[in-house]
Design a protein with these regions (language model features):
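ER/Golgi luminal nucleotide-sugar-dependent glycosyltransferases, focusing on the catalytic module
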Residues: 2-416
Length: 416
């Protein structure tokens, strides 16, 4: 069978237009990519970098495995410098840090913080700090506070590996001991303990928190405003028991996994209930944990903070000053709040006497192997992050935890 052959025609004249169109398209795509990168410079990558090197876990005479903490650090307008200082004070290569300045903060504050994290050599090497670029709108006393916390938890569950406890702090917080102290003592604890102050004896809060119905405009508006109150009141719930306490918590990964994924409907049901609850961060996690049989026996009734209140208590705790320093130390708590925005004297004393930290530097620990005799930052030269050197402050934390876990205190104060 004879095949048909089509006559050859020279189509080389088509190459030039095709080449021109390709160049124009490529130029457009590159410019579009550049524009997107520029316009979304504050967008989070939602990923922690892998360290450029790794060290094996310690095995010094069969010592217990060191835990990892996942910190959420929050702030608002004007808090950028204080958030940076807090990050430096609690930084440790083993941990993870998620930093969030809410929508009230300026883009320049957020950019300055992200720029610092990106440029800091130690953080760059260990890749364990992330700044949220797309900020959440947070309304004081509203459920958007819980939403922001759950947002942070979800990111940490997705992107950070092998952490044991979640700690939420704000720009008003500061540590009273080094991370080496905390990591060392917590290495001896069961990994299923959840630290949160809680009680079902809500007293005056029944009529000022539980029965009123509030609406948080931050759920559906893009500009910040206060909550507003409905005329109607509601009765106390019958299908679950209310618990309230401090919004500052140290919670396990397994419990927070349950809160986010909720393989039964309790976390979602309570989240919907607390949408109309004033100061919901003071009750959401507490009510979830104490109404579920798998977690109600894991609670330790303490928020691991030193907080001083007026008598009778006011809406906010007292501002801590130098006169409270000795009480802070004796408390054995790893954290304290709240500190004045315009007076650093108490923080400076904590830095000098408890953290051995110089201004603008990280709190030194076993991972810092540089010399400090010449005034240089010892953490500029870093070694094995699994080498911890606890200070005398660890003994105070140990004493506090022994008291909290004593048979006479532990079970009798769980979800009561």
């Amino acid at each position: 069978m004879k095949r048909t052959h089509f006559p050859y025609s020279d189509r080389s004249w088509l190459l030039l237009p095709i080449l021109i169109i390709s160049i124009i398209s490529l130029t457009f795509l590159l410019s579009l990519t550049f524009t997107q990168n520029k316009s979304s410079s504050f967008e989070p990558e939602f990923s922690f970098q892998e360290p450029r090197f790794s060290f094996s876990e310690r095995d010094y005479g069969r010592l217990p495995r060191l835990p990892r903490f996942a910190y959420s650090i929050s702030g608002t307008k004007g808090d950028g410098p204080r958030v940076k200082r807090l990050l430096q004070a609690i930084y440790h290569p083993r941990n993870y840090y998620l930093v969030h300045l809410d929508l009230d903060a300026s883009d320049s504050e957020r950019f300055d913080l992200a720029k610092y994290v990106k440029a800091e050599g130690v953080i760059k090497e260990f890749g364990n700090v992330m700044v949220i670029g797309k900020a959440d709108l947070v309304t004081y006393k509203g459920p958007t506070m819980v939403a922001a916390t759950l947002h942070a938890v979800a990111i940490l569950l997705k992107e950070a590996k092998d952490w044991d406890w979640f700690v939420n702090l704000s720009a008003d917080d500061y540590p009273l001991m080094t991370q080496d102290d905390i990591v060392h003592i917590f290495s001896y604890l069961p990994r299923d303990l959840n630290f949160l102050e809680h009680t079902s004896s809500i007293g005056w809060k029944e009529y000022q928190r539980a029965r009123p119905i509030i609406i948080d405009p931050g759920l559906y508006h893009s500009k910040k405003s206060g909550v507003f109150w409905a005329k109607e009141k509601r009765s106390l719930p019958a299908s679950f028991k209310l618990f309230m306490g401090s919004e500052w918590v140290v919670l396990t990964k397994s419990f927070l996994d349950f809160c986010v994924w909720g393989w039964d409907n309790l976390p979602r049901t309570l989240l919907m209930y607390y949408t109309n609850f004033i100061s919901s961060p003071e009750g959401y996690f507490h009510t979830v944990i104490c109404n579920h049989k798998d977690y109600q026996n894991t609670t330790v009734n303490h928020d691991l903070h030193y907080i001083r209140w007026d008598n009778p208590p006011k809406q906010h705790p007292m501002t801590l000053t130098l006169e409270h320093f000795d009480d802070m130390v004796r408390s054995g708590a790893p954290f304290a709040r709240k500190f004045a925005k315009d007076d650093d004297s108490a923080l400076n004393k904590i830095d000098k006497e408890l953290l051995r930290r110089s201004n603008g530097r990280f709190t030194p620990g076993g991972w810092c192997v540089g010399g400090s005799n010449s005034g240089k930052d010892p953490c500029v030269v870093y070694g094995n992050p699994n080498a911890v050197k606890p200070t005398v402050s660890s003994k105070r934390l140990e004493k506090l935890l022994v008291q909290l876990l004593d048979s006479g205190n532990f079970r009798s104060k769980q979800c009561k």
